[in-house]
Amino acid sequence: MKPHPPPPPPPGSRGWGAGATGRRRAFACALAGAALAFALLCLFHGAAFGPTLRLRASQVQAQAPLPDGLALSSLPVCDARHSELIPCLDRGLHHQLRLRLNLSLMEHYERHCPPAPRRLNCLIPPPDGYLVPIRWPRSRDEVWTANIPHTHLASEKSDQRWMVVNGDKINFPGGGTHFHHGADKYIVNLAQMLGFPNDKLNNEGNIRNVLDVGCGVASFGAYLLPLDIIAMSLAPNDVHENQIQFALERGIPSTLGVLGTRRLPYPSRSFELAHCSRCRIDWLQRDGILLLEVDRVLRPGGYFVYSSPEAYAHHDPANRKIWKQMSNLAQRMCWRIASKEGQTVIWVKPLTNGCYMRREPRALPPMCAHDDDPDAAWNVLMKACITPYSKRVNKAKGAELLPWPQRLTAPPPRLEEIGISSKNFSEDNEIWNSRVAQYWKLMKSEIQKYSFRNVMDMNANLGGFAASLRKKDVWVMNVAPFMESGKLKIIYDRGLIGTIHDWCESFSTYPRTYDLLHAWLLFSEMENQGCGLEDLLIEMDRIMRPHGHAIIRDKAAVIDYIKKLLPALRWDDWSSEVKPKRDALSSDDERVLIVRKKLWDQAAQAAS
C-alpha cells in the first residue's frame, strides 16, 4: 500500500526555505522560532508548564520550523533508580494508581501503562559502569556483570548451572532446572522421543517456531538456534531475577509476557511446538484456560512438551492427582500423547476437526463461538474454549507450510485472508532486499560483522525487512502495530517471530535491549493517531543500546524534525541521510535517516 502524500503547505505559504524581507518579518520569524524552542523545552522538561503538551511534525511545518542553526541541545536524564524502567510493567505504578489487581490471576505481571501526566519525559540512564555489550556469538555464554547487576539468580540456581558469576562477567553453562547436564543434550533427547531424523528437533525444517513459557534465562532457546529453530522465550517481569533481561543481553530471542487473563499477543497457529520445563504454571486453573491459550497458538499437529515432576508421578500422591487431571484435560482437548519418558511428556494437537466433532454434546471445554476471531490478540481476554480449524485447514490436514527455509520466501497460505496476492508478496520481498542492501551500504564504514544481534522492525508489514536479513547473524522482533495485527500471521507463517503492539504505549522490554531499530513510516502513522512523536523517540532511546543504530524512513518533514532532536537524544554519534531510490512502496517525499546512539555516562553528564 502506498503511503499518503504529504499535506499541502498552508495557504499563502512560501515553503520552509522562503526568505523574509524587512525588519518586522525577521523579528517575527525569530520570535516564532524562540517560542517554538521554548515550547519544546517545556515539553521535555514537561512538568510545570505543560505536562500533556505534544507537538506534531505537521504542526511544526504549518507554523514555523526551528531555525537552521537551532536544535534542542539536551533532554533531562531520569533518576538512576529508573535505569531498568519498563513503564507499562512498573510495579511502583500499581501502587501509585491504586490498581486493584488479582494476584492469583497474574494481573500484576500484565501491562498497565501510565497515563500521560505520569509519563517520564526523560532519558533512561545506563547503570554505573555500563559497558558496550559483548558481541554475539560470545554473548551466548557470557555478559558483563555491570550491565545487569543482579547476581541473586546465580546463587539461587547454582546447583542447576543456570549462570555463574566470574568477576566482571556472568557465564551461562547452559543448564536449567530440568536439564542439569545441558540444554543441548535435553533437546537431542526430545528429538529422540519423537523419532525425528538424525536426532534433530527441527525435523528437517518442519519445526521452526517454538514458544518457551517460563523460560528462565532462555538457554533452551539458545541451544535451538544451531538447529535453525527460533524460540519466542517468554517470562514475566521479575524485579528480583531479571531472567529475560539476561536472555536479551545474551542475544537470545525473548520477551516479557505472562499467561494471565489476556491472550498472548500472537495470532492463532503460530508455533509448531510449545515448551514448559518446570515453568510453575497451574495449567488446571479456570477450566484449563491457560492450556487452551497454548492450544490457540499451536499449529495443527503441533507439540506441547511438558517437563515436570507431575509427569513422573508414581510415588507422590499430590503429583499423581495433578497428572490425572492434566491427562484428562488434554484428552478432552483432543491432544494425544506422542511420547512419554521420565519426567517429560509430549502431547500432539490434532490435524483436523475430526476429534472435536466426535466429542459428546456439551463436552468441556466447549468449542469457541463462530464469531470469535482467534487472531484477535491485542488486549483481548482469554477464553476457555477450543479454537476449531477453518474449512481450508481442516481439508488440508495441516498448516500447508513448506519446511524452513523455503517457507521464508514462499507465499504463505494465509495471504488470501488479508487480501494480498502472491505476486504482491514476491514484489515486496524484492523491494526489501534492495532497501536493506542500500541501508547496509550506507552503514558499511561504521559497522562490523557482529555490530547487530538484537534487531526490531517497529512496523514490520509482511516481514520483508527481517527476511532480507536471513544471511546475517541476527534475530528480528517483528512488530505489527495493532491496527494491522492481521499481518502478523503472515510473519509467523514465514518462520519469523514477532508481536502486536500499540506504539502510543511503551514496549514490554528492558532498557538497552536492541542493537538496531527500523522504523518505516511509523512516525507518520503515530502522527495520524495523534500520538506524540517525542514520546516515541524517547521510547526508542530507552530500548536501544548505546552504540546502537536506528534506521528511520519517513516523510521529509518528519526526518527534518527528528534531525533537530538528535543532539538532545544523544543520537549524534554518527548519522547519514539520503533520498532513497523510488520503489512501489515509497513516495517521492521519503527520506532515510540512519543514526547511532552515544554511550554516555550519567555522572559525567551531571558534572559537565
Where are the language model's segments positioned?
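Intrinsically disordered, low-complexity glycine/charged-rich regulatory or linker segments
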Residues: 2-205, 315, 327-328, 332-450, ...
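Conserved class I S-adenosyl-L-methionine
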Residues: 204-216, 220-222, 232, 248, 304-330, 341, 449-470, 550-571, ...
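Conserved SAM-binding motif I beta-strand of class I
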Residues: 230-236, 256, 475-480
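Conserved SAM-binding strand-loop segment of SAM-dependent methyltransferases
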Residues: 251-260, 495-504
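A short acidic, Gly/Pro-enriched loop at the edge of an enzyme's catalytic core
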Residues: 261-274, 285, 289, 493-494, ...
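A short glycine-rich, Lys/Arg-flanked "PGG" loop and its adjoining helix->strand segment in the class I
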Residues: 267, 286-301, 512, 529-547, ...
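C-terminal interaction modules of eukaryotic adaptor/scaffold proteins
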Residues: 464, 474, 490-493, 499, ...
